[in-house]
Regions:
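Surface-exposed, active-site-proximal loop segments in enzymatic domains
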Residues: 14-22
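Divalent-metal (Mg2+/Mn2+/Ca2+)-assisted nucleotide/phosphate chemistry catalytic cores
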Residues: 23-148
C-alpha cells in the first residue's frame, strides 16, 4: 500500500530544507492548488488504485497546544542545530525562526500517524526522516526504513531543481518546452542527469 502524503498543514510554514533564508509561508488556497498539481504529477508514476492520499492537516489541526508542547519535548535544540542548513544559518549570522524548527517534528510525526514502513525522500530530507524513526520508536513502532535519492540539480547547475527557483523542467510541460529546456543544459549537467535519472554514465 503506497501512501501519498500531502503536507497541507506544514506547507503554511514552508519547508526550510536546504534554505539559507526563511521560506515565505503559503496561503491555504495556494497549498490546495499545489496539492492538486502534486497528485496529478504523482499519478504519472504511481498506480492511482493502489495509492492512498492523506493530508496531514487532518491530525495537526486537531492537536491542542498541550499536545504540541509534548511533541516538541521529544526533540532537543541540540538535535535541531545539528541539522546542516540550520547550523549554516546560525553560523552565518542568519535567522532561524522557531516555527521552522517545527517542520522536521511535524514530518516525523506524519510517519507515526500513517505507521510508515518506508519513507522516500531527497537527501535533504534525511534529518526529517530520522526524526520520524525516533518518534516511531518512542511510540513502540518498528522504525521506518529511510530511502533517500540524490537531489537533481536545476538547469542553472547550482541549486536543486525547483519551481520556486525557476530552474526546473516540469513533468507536465509540453514536450517542446521540455526539449528546449534540456537543450539549454550544459554538457557537465547532462552527465549528472544521465547518472541520476538513468542510473548510468553517458557514452562520450
Amino acid at each position: 500500500q503506497a501512501v501519498l502524503l500531502i503536507g497541507d498543514f506544514p506547507a503554511t510554514i514552508g519547508d526550510p530544507s536546504g534554505r539559507s533564508v526563511t521560506r515565505p509561508p503559503l496561503s491555504r488556497e495556494q497549498v490546495l492548488e499545489n496539492a492538486e498539481t502534486y497528485t496529478k504529477q504523482a499519478f504519472k508514476i504511481l498506480d492511482r488504485d493502489k495509492t492512498e492520499i492523506v493530508y496531514n492537516g487532518d491530525w495537526f489541526r486537531k492537536m491542542t497546544y498541550e499536545e504540541v508542547l509534548k511533541l516538541n519535548s521529544r526533540v532537543t535544540m541540540q538535535q535541531m542545530l545539528a541539522r546542516e542548513d540550520f547550523k549554516a544559518r546560525v553560523e552565518g549570522g542568519k535567522e532561524v525562526r522557531l516555527h521552522e524548527m517545527q517542520y522536521p517534528i511535524m514530518q516525523g510525526w506524519d510517519s507515526v500517524e500513517i505507521r510508515a514502513d518506508v519513507e522516500l525522500g531527497g537527501t535533504d530530507q534525511l534529518f526529517n526522516i530520522l526524526v520520524g524513526r525516533d518518534l516511531q520508536k518512542e511510540e513502540g513502532m518498528l522504525p521506518q526504513i529511510a530511502m533517500t535519492m540524490p537531489l537533481l540539480e536545476g538547469l542553472d547547475g547550482v541549486r536543486k531543481m525547483s519551481k520556486s527557483y525557476g530552474n526546473y523542467v516540469g513533468v507536465d510541460e509540453a514536450p517542446e518546452m521540455m526539449f528546449g529546456k534540456m537543450m539549454s543544459a550544459s554538457d557537465e549537467l547532462m552527465d549528472r542527469y544521465y547518472l541520476v535519472l538513468l542510473g548510468e554514465k553517458r557514452d562520450m
